[in-house]
Amino acid sequence: MAKKILFVGFGRSGKDTAGEFLAEHCGLRYGGSTSWAALPLMAEFLKVHPMVAWENRHKNRELWKSHCDELRKDDPCRLIRLALAQGDVITGVRGLPEIQAARKESLFDHIIWVANPRVPVDPTVDFGIDECNGVVVNEGTLEEYHRKLAQMAAFAFSAENFSPYALKLL
């Protein structure tokens, strides 16, 4: 059974890049973000085409956060489960109740905080590094970030499905 990994952190820190790297180079399936899982519901709420909702999500961060909180009111893991149905690695959890419920239900083998000193504190994330069981720092080049991700993945699970690129980074 594949490992389940959640990457969290402030907006634009490199969470999606981490998920995409593990999918492309480490043999895991990337399920996208919880925002992606919420997209059809958000587009319906906003009464716009999903493409318009997605393209404007960063301009509407607080609205997305508040409506996604409403969507999760009765089931904190609702969006997490939707994303996990698409893959083993997901990103984008922003609420403390989500993290706590996911831990209680043992939905993930690893919850990794992506720390990036180049991005500002994100007010839509209401928990911190202390809720995670690992950290990866994204502060250099893309190749340096990939190296850290490959090393983390090799430590967390087998490297038998790694691409030649990921193996070279070890």
Predicted segments — roles?
Residues L82-V125:
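ATP-dependent NMP and nucleoside kinases share a basic, alpha-helical "lid"
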Residues G11-S13, S33-L39, V114-V121, T141:
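Short, acidic/turn-prone active-site loops that include or flank metal/cofactor-
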